[in-house]
Amino acid sequence: MIEYRSVQEHLHSPDLGNYCAYGIYAYQVEPSSSKNILAIHDVFLNAADAISFVHRCNQLELSPVSLYDVIQ
């Protein structure tokens, strides 16, 4: 089973300085473990938007292959 999670990231940009963003991570979840299989960084600036997005991805059982397209 695939599970999506939002992850808070502390980043730095020469133009913006330090800032906080949220990435989207896909995990392959097994009964005894979970493994990160895909990470897309710096997707959202708002935590609520990131949480809502991963909730929809999990609810719709989105394939990791489609994650880049859905984010765009």
Predicted regions: what they are:
Residues M1-G23:
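Short N-terminal "domain-start" leader segments
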Residues D15-I37:
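Short aromatic-glycine-(Arg/Gly/Cys) micro-motifs in beta-strand/loop hairpins
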Residues G23-A26, D42-N46, L60-L62:
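Short, low-complexity, polar/charged sequence segments that are solvent-exposed and flexible
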Residues E30, I51-V54, L67:
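Short intrinsically disordered, low-complexity segments
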Residues K35-S52, C57:
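A short, exposed loop/beta-hairpin motif centered on an aromatic-Gly-Thr core
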Residues L60-Q72:
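Short, mixed-charge low-complexity intrinsically disordered segments
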